UniProtKB/Swiss-Prot annotation:
Record keywords, A-Z: ATP-binding, DNA-binding, Metal-binding, Nucleotide-binding, Repressor, Transcription, Transcription regulation, Zinc, Zinc-finger
Short name of one Pfam family: Zn_ribbon_NrdR
unnamed zinc finger locations on the chain: 3-34
Signal peptide segment: none
Cofactor: Zn(2+)
Organism in which the protein naturally occurs: Clostridium acetobutylicum (strain ATCC 824 / DSM 792 / JCM 1419 / IAM 19013 / LMG 5710 / NBRC 13948 / NRRL B-527 / VKM B-1787 / 2291 / W)
UniProt gene name: nrdR
Family, as annotated: Belongs to the NrdR family.
Protein name: Transcriptional repressor NrdR
PANTHER family the record matches: TRANSCRIPTIONAL REPRESSOR NRDR
GO terms, molecular function: ATP binding; DNA binding; zinc ion binding
Keyword presence, ATP-binding: yes
UniProt xrefs under HAMAP family: NrdR
GO biological process: negative regulation of DNA-templated transcription
Amino acid sequence: MKCPFCGYSESKVVDSRSTEDNMAIRRRRECLECSKRYTTYEKVEDIPILVIKKDSSREFFDKSKVINGLIKSCEKRPVSRQQIEDIASDVEKSISNQMVTEVKSDAIGEMVMEKLKEIDEIAYVRFASVYRQFKDINTFMEEILNLVNKK
């Protein structure tokens, strides 16, 4: 691995440990030429997952899109950035664990909503209103009533 500071290709590992989620190994390295330290991560290469959109087009799963949707839904709500990232990671992990190469966008939306419902109901309703594309106030109210009745 090349040193990001001087480009030298040899280094020694100073420290090595698993990340919190045990999905990668964090290595602290020291360049043998300039002695500067830097961090690398080693993880299993993921199989790319294709998302089948509502119009039947396909695109690669992008965790940042899930995070951005959650950020909009959780705006001005007591939901931390870490909780948002945890939801996105849980959804990504759940899809990977299914060992599929394609997943419908509907399934992703449902997974996000289930996780969001546990954390903040207002953010859940906001996400659902965009995801489910409510046509009028009645369908919006039905969703809220379903949420209230499930308590």
